Amino acid sequence: MKILGEVFDRAADLCDDPLQSFLVGLKLLAEIFADLPGGHPGCMIASICYQERLFDRRVLELNRVAVESMNARFRRHLEAIAAVYPPAEPIDLDTLAEMASCVIDGGIIMSRVMADSNRLVQQILGYRALIKRHFSPAQELALQPPPNVTAVNLQARVVSG
């Protein structure tokens, strides 16, 4: 939790625009996880979910509060973004905020299961791309090539089209 606060506070210091600040924060978070030797060491939240019967009610409550706090932090970022950049499609911001938590926790689990520390980084960057496309103004999106289009593919389309 502390690392999320530090990362997104730093991003807010770097950029006043709420969308750009959130995108910078996600990129910084991905970079931090990419720099961890051997990937993220694990996730207490995921462990508690899978082994719930091994933990007492106090630990389960702390887990719930931590998740709610993380979701609320993401929700505040998304509210600030939506106030400036209306979403491309109607979407519940609580769902989008929870998705960030799911991406991070799920990315940690996927990285461990697949023995590939890059999975977490790719999941965060994928969520970042989704947020960018969902909240970017339409005219800005019109100037961007579709995802996964390389310069060579783009040039081939122009020549053959």
Task: Give the role of each language-model region.
Residues 1-4, 18, 22-25, 66, ...:
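Hydrophobic/aromatic residues within well-ordered alpha-helical segments
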Residues 9-41, 88, 93, 97-100:
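Hydrophobic alpha-helical connector segments
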Residues 15-19, 56-59, 63, 89-93, ...:
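Residue-level recognition of alpha-helical structural elements
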Residues 20-22, 37-61:
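Amphipathic alpha-helical segments used for helix-helix packing
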Residues 32, 36, 101-118, 130-140:
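Amphipathic C-terminal alpha-helical segment
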Residues 41-47, 88-110, 126-130:
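Hydrophobic alpha-helical segments that form the core
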Residues 52-57, 67-96, 132-141, 149:
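Hydrophobic alpha-helical bundle segments that form small-molecule/ligand-binding pockets
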Residues 137-161:
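C-terminal effector-binding regulatory domain of bacterial HTH transcription factors
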